[in-house]
């Protein structure tokens, strides 16, 4: 018996099987709605910034002098 999951967009039951063309979505419409949400940044994967902007102040960099050279 195949696994049944809910479509992340409309919550319609979707059979998780090779013949389910749009899994985990129920249709191309729901798949495209999800893609649009990612493209418009409604969804995002949380990440911690690699740069500490406060740490840059420790160097007391003079940007004007740097860009004149």
UniProtKB/Swiss-Prot annotation:
Gene Ontology molecular functions: DNA topoisomerase type II (double strand cut, ATP-hydrolyzing) inhibitor activity; zinc ion binding
Cofactor binding note from Swiss-Prot or TrEMBL: Binds 1 zinc ion.
Keywords assigned: Metal-binding, Zinc
Zinc as UniProt keyword: yes
Domain of life where this protein originates: Bacteria
Quaternary structure annotation from Swiss-Prot or TrEMBL: Interacts with GyrB.
The family this protein is said to belong to: Belongs to the DNA gyrase inhibitor YacG family.
PANTHER family cross-referenced by the UniProt entry: DNA GYRASE INHIBITOR YACG
Name assigned to this protein: DNA gyrase inhibitor YacG
Originating organism: Shewanella sp. (strain W3-18-1)
Name of encoding gene: yacG
